[in-house]
Amino acid sequence: MGITVLKNEGLDFHARISTPLSEIDDDIQKELLDLTKKVKIPGFRAGKVPVSIVKKKYGTSVRNDIIERRINHSVNHIIKEHNLNIIGRPKIEELQNESDKALEFTVKIELLPKITIPDLKKISLDRPKLEVNSKDVEEQLEKLAALTKNYTKESKAKIKDGDQVTIDAIGYIKEKTFEDGKLNDFKVIIGSNALIPGFEKQLIGSKTGSKVDVNVTFPENYHAKDLAGKDARFVVQIKAVHTAEPTVIDDEFAKKFQSNSLEELRTHFTKQIENESEEAINTIMKMNLFDKLEKLLDFDVPESLLEQEKNILKSGTDKNEQDESLLKDKSSKEITAYYNKLALRRVRIGLLLAEYAKSKNLQLEPDDLRKVIMQQARNFPGQENMIFDFYKNNPRAIEGLKGPALEDKAVQYIFNHEIKLKEKKYTKEELEKYLEAEEQRITLI
């Protein structure tokens, strides 16, 4: 076997490989002789079939198998001989495979870069810390109390905010009724914004037995596209008005929600408020870490990974209206530059984290995958069981989660053992503003 290295620079390794015709013919002859002992052909005893007959029947397929094995052997030999850290499948080009000539081909191999892990201990980040105060907890208690109000007291007074109103309604667009434009015995809490914006306010001041004309405009993003943005008039019959009995927030109230006391319920809400922001905090901290890493990394990346990531980004943008709107006023040159920069960032950071996980011998545990599946499920409220069933019944889909799961594990390890974290305290309102601003920023990266 002759090997001529054509290119060995950067992340590209190209070589021309030649195997003498005599070696190919010897391999074919040995394979045919073996087949004479195994094949069964009518008219011949087992093990006594002439080579010429076997060659006539199986010669082409045997030669193809030998060529494939020779190519694979040669490529594996080159990879081992030159200690190549490859990515993807080697490409075979310019194949010369005539039966009367030596086997020759060019192999093109893409390499993974040599990655030097930067000194992560020099990185410092702020870690947002939510300080839950009594006002935050009381607001949650009030919301819970509002959800559990008993509207048992019928009222003959004028409708006001907080009343429960039972209505019949018929909707008209340009004086014509429309599909799903009727309500019968519909109960609505005034001020709950359960109906089209502006609908409930126009019922205030009316009484049981009144007929009210309500004029509204369907929102542009209304789920029924044929109604979105259109003006409508509803003729509303007020059938009944009920006021809520006052809810006393005390230990007895808490016991309705599996808490032994009001103090225990308050503790539950404190933890719930903290947990609600934890995932968003972790996502933003991860992006802030990636911002720091991006400035430290300058190694070349495989072109195939770069193209693959750009295609993923473009596909994601096509499906995401928010991302699409970010690019709608950009020139094709600016859009290409955006995708190139973002793809390069993601591939570099992904390769670094994979190398870091390897250096720390980080291994995935079943719980790591469960966490990633839970994160996926949270993206589809009300369809969680469907997501769980999907991954339960699709092992290959779980394979696709292993990369992100290991990346998350590496990031958490870096947070816990490498970088300096400085706790920065926020009130609930301050944290919500901070998270909103950060979420808008990271849509660009």
From Swiss-Prot:
Catalyzed reactions: [protein]-peptidylproline (omega=180) = [protein]-peptidylproline (omega=0)
UniProt KW Isomerase keyword: yes
UniProt-listed Enzyme Commission number(s): 5.2.1.8
SUPFAM superfamilies: FKBP-like, Triger factor/SurA peptide-binding domain-like, Trigger factor ribosome-binding domain
Enzyme class: isomerase
Main location: cytoplasm
Keyword terms of this UniProt record: Cell cycle, Cell division, Chaperone, Cytoplasm, Isomerase, Rotamase
Gene Ontology cellular component annotations, sorted alphabetically: cytoplasm
InterPro entries assigned: PPIase_dom_sf, PPIase_FKBP_dom, Trig_fac, Trigger_fac_C, Trigger_fac_C_sf, Trigger_fac_ribosome-bd_bac, Trigger_fac_ribosome-bd_sf, Trigger_fact/SurA_dom_sf
Domain PPIase FKBP-type: 162-247
GO terms for biological process, alphabetical: 'de novo' cotranslational protein folding; cell division; chaperone-mediated protein folding; protein transport; protein unfolding
Compartment annotation: Cytoplasm
Any one GO molecular-function label of the UniProt entry: protein folding chaperone
A Pfam family: Trigger_N
Gene3D superfamilies: 3.10.50.40, Trigger factor ribosome-binding domain, Trigger factor, C-terminal domain
Stated role: Involved in protein export. Acts as a chaperone by maintaining the newly synthesized protein in an open conformation. Functions as a peptidyl-prolyl cis-trans isomerase.
Family assignment from sequence similarity: Belongs to the FKBP-type PPIase family. Tig subfamily.
Domain notes: Consists of 3 domains; the N-terminus binds the ribosome, the middle domain has PPIase activity, while the C-terminus has intrinsic chaperone activity on its own.
Identification of the protein by name: Trigger factor
Species classification: Bacteria, Pseudomonadati, Pseudomonadota, Alphaproteobacteria, Rickettsiales
